[in-house]
Design a protein with these regions (language model features):
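Aromatic (often tryptophan-rich) hydrophobic motifs at membrane interfaces
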Residues: 206-293, 356
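Short amphipathic alpha-helix that is part of the acyltransferase structural core
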Residues: 1-27, 134-193, 294-346
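Conserved beta-strand in the GNAT
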Residues: 45, 49-58, 210, 215-225, ...
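N-terminal ordered "arm"
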Residues: 6-53, 57-58
């Protein structure tokens, strides 16, 4: 078994000795994200054969996942250690946030037959810093119009964020949340993560910015590096009564970042239509694909083979089903001579009439 330990603030330097030189543009590999959300995912880490290995619990369940090992060179020798570790936990190997290059390496290893799938909802939006700073050309005309109206209507100032801004920022976040999902009085997971961020602001190396109109905070944002040239925006909030506040904080913040950060990762859209539209409106340079690799059980392999034989669907489609929807409890199967001959999958869904 691998000896993992929970991520703590004291681990920042060692973890970043792997992520800053080698990590892809993936928001999940920003140390501040791993630390601030540790309470949610029980994130733990270890160094195995010269690679950083991150382990976590998926969706609040007991299911274990590993991130693609981070380091220089070929990570595939680390796989046998992951297999031993997950076997000791009585589960099967699941690796998430794999790059396309990592996926190809995994395909070439005969340890296990994997299913691979990506989720558009979890792809990171990565922008050229110069585009967000300068808003050049016709495609950014609407953004420049927003800024021009804001600057014409309000006397504003930009302030670099410090821990002293925490109380004001949390109040604005609470007001913003009321307009989005209704106020329950309960502390959301994001609010807990923000509290951790502000409590350790300096030690995390966070960089943030605030927009004031007079003495009123109307927008704020903060983030941290993923690697030595990619900066990740973790949080961005604004008072929507001030038209253009989101646009102005976006531009001003990037304009005040160190020049070494040529790429800006604004994280994923989680499949939320409004968020997707907003992120696309800034014209990302690319979307960072993240693949999940799942070691298949024998019955799943048999299911996949029969599916291909009968229907000829692409493996990517079948793999996506196996990772996201397959369940032994909802599958009816018929065998002949010890081989799977027919199968029926029952998939629950929500309709206007209820759950079916």
């Amino acid at each position: 078994m691998i000896t993992f330990k929970p991520i703590t603030i004291e681990d920042k330097a060692e973890i970043e000795s792997f992520t800053l030189p080698y990590a892809p543009a993936n928001c999940d590999l920003a140390f501040a994200n791993m630390f601030c959300w540790q309470f949610q995912f029980k994130t733990a880490w270890s160094v195995v054969d010269g690679f950083l290995v991150i382990r976590f619990q998926i969706g609040g369940s007991d299911r274990i996942g590993y991130m693609q090992p981070v380091g220089a060179g070929d990570f595939t020798p680390v796989l046998r250690h992951l297999e031993e570790d997950i076997l000791a936990a009585g589960q099967r190997l699941r690796i998430i946030d794999m790059t396309p290059e990592g996926l190809e390496k995994l395909r070439s290893v005969g340890h296990c037959q994997f299913a691979f799938a990506s989720d558009r909802n979890l792809e990171d939006y990565v922008y050229n810093a110069s585009d967000l700073r300068d808003l050049p050309g016709r495609k950014y005309q609407s953004k420049r119009n927003h800024i021009n109206r804001f600057e014409a209507e309000y006397e504003y100032r930009y302030e670099p964020m410090t821990r002293d801004h925490a109380a004001e920022c949390m109040r604005l976040e609470a007001e913003w949340r009321k307009t989005r999902s209704g106020h329950t009085g309960e502390l959301s997971a994001e609010q807990r993560a923000m509290q951790r961020a502000f409590a350790h602001f300096d030690r995390l190396g966070l960089i943030g910015g605030c927009i004031y109109v007079g003495d009123k905070l109307v927008a704020f944002t903060y983030g941290s590096p993923i690697n030595d040239h990619t900066f990740c925006v973790h949080v961005e909030k604004a008072d929507t009564e001030y038209d253009g506040a989101f646009t102005i904080i976006n531009r001003e913040f990037v304009a005040h970042l160190p020049e070494q950060y040529t790429l800006i990762d604004r994280e994923e859209d989680l499949g939320i239509p409004g968020l997707r539209q907003a992120k696309l409106s800034y014209h990302p340079a690319f979307l960072e694909k993240k693949y999940t690799a799942l070691c298949l059980y024998p019955d799943e392999i048999a299911c996949k083979r029969l599916w291909i034989k009968c229907f000829g669907d692409e493996e990517t489609f079948i793999d996506s089903f196996l990772i996201g929807h397959y369940s032994r409890k909802r599958m009816l199967a018929a065998e002949e001579d010890g081989r799977l001959a027919a199968m029926l999958h029952l998939i629950p869904f929500e309709s206007e009439l209820g759950r079916a």
